[in-house]
Regions:
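Divalent metal-dependent hydrolysis catalytic cores, especially in the metallo-beta-lactamase
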Residues: 106-132, 145-155, 199-210, 238-239, ...
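His/Asp/Glu-enriched, well-ordered alpha-helical/loop segment
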Residues: 235, 304-308, 316-403
Length: 441
C-alpha cells in the first residue's frame, strides 16, 4: 500500500527496484535492470533480467520493489518555477495576497508540483522577497513536501518595465510584482539585499512582456545596470537568470554571463551565433506553455482568441517555435519550464511541456525527456549528481506505468506515475497489488 506520509518513507537498509526498464537519461535506450538505493543515493545499477523475479522478500536488508516491467526514470525537473504564483487569473491576485496566506499557498503549490513527478526545480521569481527562501527551507527540513528547489527573489526591473505595476497616482513599491530600480547603484543595493534574504539566484527583467503593455521586443535595462547586477552576483557566487524575450536582451545575457535565459523568442541570427559560441555556459527555457495557453486557452479569463493581445502572443509563439528549432539544431541546451502558475497555466500540469517539445519544437521523445531530466540537473548546477540514473547520483526517481519514449503524454497522467522518490524517500510509494493488476492486465 502507498504511504501517505508527506515527509517521505524509506527503508533504513535501502530500496531495490527490480524488473524495471531503466530510462537513465544518458541518452541510452531503456534497458531491463535493477537499481539499488541506499540512503539518498543510487548505490548500484545492474543491467539484465532481474535476479529476483516477482519476489517481495528483502534482499540484503533492502525493501524490494518489483516493477513488473514499469519504467524507472529520473524525477522531472522544471527550469522555470514560480511556486508563489497561485494559479490566479492575473498578476494582481498574486501580488495583493497577504503574506501569511501567500506563504501557505506557496507550500501548497510546491506539493502540487512534486505530486506531478517534478522532484526538482529552479525558482524563476517570487512574488514577495522571502517566499521562495522560506519554501526551500521548509522543504529541506522535511516540514512540508515539495521539490528540491533553488530559491529566487522578486524580479528586478526598471521604471516602467515588466513588474512595475503601480499606477502613477499611487507610486507605492508594495503594488509592484518586481523590485523597481533605476541606475547601477540601485541595482547594487537590491542585489545585495536579496542575497541577504537568502536567495540562490538573481532574476533581471531585461525585456518587456505583451500582457503588461511593454512590447516583448523592447530591451529597457541599460548595459551599466546589467553589468552591475552581474558583478554583484559573482561576488557572492550567485547565479543570474533573466526574462529575455527580445534579441537585445538575449545578447545582454551572453555579454554579461547570465546563465539562465528565459524565453528568447525573438533572438536574431547574431544572438544565435553568440549563444552557440557560448552554449556550454548558458541554458534556455522558452516558457512555451505561457505563449500557447495565453494565446489559445485563456478566453474564460478575458483573453479571447483573435483579440489583439491573443494575436500578439500567437505572433510570438510562431517566432518562439522557429527560434527554438534553430537553437536545437545548433546544440544549445533547451530546458522545459512553461511559466506555470496562472489560471490558464496551472501548477501541476508542467509535464505538458515535454509533449510540446516533441509536437512543436521537433525534439525526439528521448531529447524531450533529456530536456526535463539531464539538462534540468545541469541548470540546477547539480549536473554531476542530479538528473540521471547513475551510480552515486541522488535518488530522485519516478516509477512509471508504461514507456515514456513511446508516448511522452503518459508523464502528464498522475495515475501512471506509480511511485515518486525524492532524496531516497518515497513521496508516493508504489501500491504493489494495484500495480501488478495494472501491469499484467
Amino acid at each position: 500500500m502507498a504511504d501517505d506520509n508527506w515527509n517521505g518513507t524509506s527503508s533504513s537498509n535501502g530500496t531495490l527496484f527490480t524488473n524495471v526498464r531503466v530510462l537513465d537519461a544518458t541518452g541510452e535506450y531503456p534497458y531491463t535492470g535493477e537499481v539499488l538505493v541506499q540512503g539518498n543515493r543510487i548505490k548500484q545499477i545492474t543491467k539484465g533480467s532481474s535476479r529476483f523475479g516477482s519476489s517481495s522478500s528483502p534482499y540484503g536488508g533492502a525493501t524490494v520493489i518489483d516493477g513488473m516491467g514499469a519504467t524507472l526514470m529520473p524525477g522531472l525537473i522544471d527550469a522555470h518555477l514560480h511556486l508563489s504564483w497561485n494559479n490566479a487569473p492575473g498578476i494582481d491576485p498574486i501580488q495583493m495576497m497577504e503574506v501569511e496566506e501567500h506563504m501557505l499557498v506557496t507550500m501548497e503549490m510546491a506539493k502540487l508540483v512534486l505530486d506531478a513527478g517534478f522532484t526538482a526545480g529552479r525558482g524563476a521569481a517570487a512574488a514577495k522577497p522571502r517566499l521562495d527562501v522560506v519554501c526551500k527551507k521548509f522543504i529541506n527540513q522535511g516540514r512540508f513536501p515539495g521539490p528540491r528547489y533553488l530559491a529566487a527573489g522578486p524580479e528586478i526591473t526598471t521604471v516602467g518595465g515588466l513588474g512595475d505595476s503601480s499606477p502613477s497616482h499611487i507610486p507605492h513599491e508594495g503594488l509592484n510584482l518586481g523590485i523597481v530600480v533605476s541606475g547601477p547603484e540601485e541595482i547594487r543595493r537590491t542585489v545585495r539585499q536579496l542575497i541577504k534574504y537568502g536567495v540562490d539566484s538573481i532574476k533581471l527583467n531585461l525585456s518587456g512582456e505583451s500582457i503588461t503593455g511593454m512590447g516583448a521586443e523592447e530591451t529597457p535595462m541599460s548595459e551599466e545596470e546589467v553589468a552591475m547586477a552581474a558583478s554583484e552576483a559573482r561576488c557572492r557566487n550567485k547565479v543570474l537568470s533573466a526574462h529575455a524575450r527580445s534579441s537585445g536582451s538575449v545578447k545582454q545575457c551572453i555579454r554579461h554571463g547570465i546563465q539562465n535565459i528565459y524565453h528568447a523568442s525573438f533572438a536574431d541570427e547574431e544572438a544565435l551565433d553568440m549563444l552557440e559560441a557560448a552554449k556550454d555556459r548558458h541554458f534556455v527555457a522558452p516558457g512555451i506553455a505561457w505563449l500557447i495557453n495565453t494565446a489559445r486557452h485563456a478566453e474564460q479569463w478575458g483573453i479571447k482568441p483573435g483579440s489583439p493581445l491573443s494575436m500578439e502572443y500567437e505572433r510570438e509563439l510562431e517566432m518562439c517555435v522557429e527560434t527554438m528549432k534553430k537553437m536545437h539544431r545548433r546544440g544549445i541546451r533547451i530546458c522545459i519550464g512553461g511559466d506555470y502558475g496562472f489560471a490558464w497555466t496551472p501548477q501541476g500540469t508542467n509535464a505538458k511541456d515535454i509533449q510540446t517539445f516533441v509536437e512543436m519544437l521537433g525534439f525526439s521523445p528521448m531529447e524531450a525527456i533529456l530536456a526535463s531530466t539531464k539538462f534540468g540537473g545541469q541548470i540546477m548546477n547539480m549536473g554531476d549528481e542530479l538528473g540521471m540514473i547513475k551510480e552515486g547520483y541522488l535518488a530522485d526517481l519516478l516509477l512509471v506505468d508504461g514507456d515514456p519514449i513511446s508516448d511522452v503524454r503518459i508523464l502528464q497522467d498522475k495515475n501512471r506515475i506509480l511511485a515518486i522518490m525524492k532524496d531516497g524517500k518515497f513521496h508516493k510509494a508504489p501500491r504493489i497489488n494495484e500495480q501488478r493488476r495494472r501491469l499484467t492486465a
